[in-house]
Amino acid sequence: MLKIIRAGMYTTVQDGGRHGFRQSGISHCGALDMPALRIANLLVGNDANAPALEITLGQLTVEFETDGWFALTGAGCEARLDDNAVWTGWRLPMKAGQRLTLKRPQHGMRSYLAVAGGIDVPPVMGSCSTDLKVGIGGLEGRLLKDGDRLPIGKSKRDSMEAQGVKQLLWGNRIRALPGPEYHEFDRASQDAFWRSPWQLSSQSNRMGYRLQGQILKRTTDRELLSHGLLPGVVQVPHNGQPIVLMNDAQTTGGYPRIACIIEADMYHLAQIPLGQPIHFVQCSLEEALKARQDQQRYFEQLAWRLHNEN
């Protein structure tokens, strides 16, 4: 078992996400920084998309109630296992009774804690990810709180050694494709979207990142029919300030879509702190597909290397 001593401000169970239910209004959910989740899981011998803890802004303390292995990835924060420093991107042994403590991150926003065997909570609609809107997944469909105890599954590996891997770097230059209504915005707004810095609003959450910057204006007042939405779509509501839809976003909407962030760059957004400028970089569909293929190839190679170690 894994006992939550101090839950932090926003800690949930997340995995690779909930697929195939968008027609029923069920959001994708899942880890916001998918590369960090996958690296943590692969380090401890789990499936890449196994359930783990997503910890926003640190300030977490957990107690391990069984021996095993864990890995901490994502945001760079000061972490300690009892009195020993813990590096992110490393697989390390844990003993029953030991406590892992995370302070507020110095770099990034979200950390991921995976344990060998995974967080063993029951899947709902094919996923263990917490959906706070619907109240499903994770532990009772809610944020974790002090005193919670989470079961740990059986490890797939009989033996391991301490090991670290290089994490994917994140930055504030985010590649995106023009959206379906891109050409409904005036030229000044199109230029501003790509050339002007955007600030992440404090009203941002796992549903959407609200951006602050130059007001974007359309050249038409036509109303749009409701359309399907996915994480990464950049909507522009009536106030002219963009909203980037994130993993917990609604599945339909009617605001104009000025752009869509490429899948391979979504993890950058998960780690950008409030107040840091965001710059969008226009790319082609071919570049977006290549970026996704390169990222998939990286994880295939990492999984092979870790599976065949020793």
Swiss-Prot record:
The keyword Nucleotide-binding applies. It catalyses: 5-oxo-L-proline + ATP + 2 H2O = L-glutamate + ADP + phosphate + H(+). Disulfide bonds: none annotated. The keyword Magnesium does not apply. Its EC number is 3.5.2.9. Disruption phenotype: Deletion of the gene slows growth on minimal medium with ammonium as nitrogen source. SMART domains: AHS2. GO terms for cellular component: cytosol. Pfam families: CT_A_B. GO terms for molecular function: 5-oxoprolinase (ATP-hydrolyzing) activity; ATP binding. Keywords: ATP-binding, Hydrolase, Nucleotide-binding. PANTHER family: 5-OXOPROLINASE SUBUNIT C. Forms a complex composed of PxpA, PxpB and PxpC. Belongs to the PxpC family. Catalyzes the cleavage of 5-oxoproline to form L-glutamate coupled to the hydrolysis of ATP to ADP and inorganic phosphate. This is 5-oxoprolinase subunit C. It comes from Escherichia coli (strain K12). The gene is pxpC.
